């Protein structure tokens, strides 16, 4: 059995949980998938945006933009498997269509915002649906 690793989160603040409930049918419309990061690059003229080229297991490369450059350098993410919601309507940012949203965990620690892109085991294939 592997030991359980614990971190000290006593200095961490998290956002309160939404009080408004979402019915199951609305939630079930959200399509969360494992996506393999094929390429990642900084978006010119943007301090925050990274452009991800992703394998979503179904079609040609999917492009998603995410404002996480403050937390990650592009090269450290290539080859990783992340989680995305893939059935959002395309949204144009900096002239580029973003076809979904990568999922991150956000918290505040010692007065600074922290962000972690949700990544899963690389043995999970691109396109695997999350329930």
Q: Which residue ranges define each predicted feature?
A:
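Phosphate-backbone binding interfaces of nucleic-acid-interacting proteins
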Residues: 2-131
